[in-house]
């Protein structure tokens, strides 16, 4: 069974920008969510995918991801996902033998910059770059649904400080 082991962090400063080795515009949409699981469609560059993600246990969850036709992804994003879509630029940033994904959000989530690292084992050691901030792997305030709700309720994008101050 495919397992994703991922840790997520706030980004504290722009020190990562000088190390970018690749960048890609992505559009993600939430197809559905139930009992801690979710189905996400993604469109980026020349590829599209759909992922079924299981309930998170710490930094671990099952993930089944499949390529789909770009036209199908566009249709799902436009007709199924509605306002549960997010646009971001994902930057690949190498550091100490790992490639970090640094996501810079746009639109309703503008101003939010998150970094994630995928590991092969939950106890795998890694060196944290100087530009890394607080870990948010299990912080429900930074789940996409919570980010959307908080920004929608505020009627504007929120700063990271406002998100950190928000109740879960």
Which residues does each PLM region occupy?
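Phosphate-end processing signature that detects enzymes handling 5′-triphosphorylated RNA
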Residues: 1-168
């Amino acid at each position: 069974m495919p397992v994703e082991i991922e840790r997520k962090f706030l980004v504290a400063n722009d020190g990562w920008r000088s190390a970018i080795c690749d960048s890609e515009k992505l559009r993600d949409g939430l197809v559905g969510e139930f009992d801690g699981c979710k189905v996400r469609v993604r469109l980026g560059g020349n590829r599209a995918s759909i992922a079924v993600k299981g309930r998170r246990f710490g930094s671990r969850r099952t993930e089944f991801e499949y390529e789909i036709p770009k036209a199908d992804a566009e249709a799902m994003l436009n007709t199924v996902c509605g306002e549960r879509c997010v646009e971001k630029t994902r930057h690949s940033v190498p550091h100490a033998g790992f490639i970090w994904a640094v996501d810079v959000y746009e639109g309703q989530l503008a101003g939010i910059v998150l970094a994630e690292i995928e590991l092969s084992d939950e106890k795998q050691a890694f060196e944290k770059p100087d530009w890394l901030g607080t870990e948010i792997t299990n912080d429900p305030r930074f789940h996409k649904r919570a980010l959307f709700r908080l920004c929608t309720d505020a009627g504007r994008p929120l700063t990271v400080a406002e998100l950190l101050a928000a109740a879960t």
